[in-house]
Amino acid sequence: MEQQKIPQATAKRLPLYYRFIQNLSLSGKQRVSSAELSEAVKVDSATIRRDFSYFGALGKKGYGYNVNYLLSFFRETLDQDDITRVALIGVGNLGTAFLHYNFTKNNNTKIEMAFDVSEEKVGTEIGGIPVYHLDELEERLSTDIQVAILTVPATVAQSVADRLAETNVHGILNFTPARLNVSESIRIHHIDLAVELQTLVYFLKNYPQ
């Protein structure tokens, strides 16, 4: 996607389109219109058409989009045939939930190992995923693991991120409230659940539907 120079906002919507198109294909549907896509993914039709236009002619006016063609296109664009191996750091309540879930709907994304400092958890398996001591982080992280999920206490998030920066990890999904400072070679996505909830409550009160 980087080579095609598409806007980041468009890139963020591609997995959303792909998931819906997967469901359409499984249901046996052969074609879909931008209006149908819009209703399903809650993105306006004009935005969908503009997003798709960055990749050339994906559909035909008056016909819509061929579902199997879109499925094949997005699978290749999103590298769905390549396995993304992930490490999780912090096996608290949220981390444990991730280990049990382990992206079961995304066959190309797998948490392969987890790290914690709790003696009760180190040396065990949760959801079939081995849990190692945090002291083993650099030793255990192989060159195959390029993404880390951070679910540690905010007070230690930066120090863990600093250690990850010394490995082959290039992407961090940060679920802590801490705003991390790392080199530009590492991409961080921050997801603060408390902030998301506060934002939702604000919109419910001030922008009623």
UniProtKB/Swiss-Prot annotation:
Residue ranges for the DNA-binding region feature of this UniProt entry: 16-55
Cellular component annotations (GO), alphabetically ordered: cytoplasm
Compartment annotation: Cytoplasm
Keywords, comma-separated and alphabetical: Cytoplasm, DNA-binding, NAD, Repressor, Transcription, Transcription regulation
Major place of residence: cytoplasm
GO annotation (BP), single: negative regulation of DNA-templated transcription
The protein's name: Redox-sensing transcriptional repressor Rex
Taxonomic lineage: Bacteria, Bacillati, Bacillota, Bacilli, Bacillales
Gene designation: rex
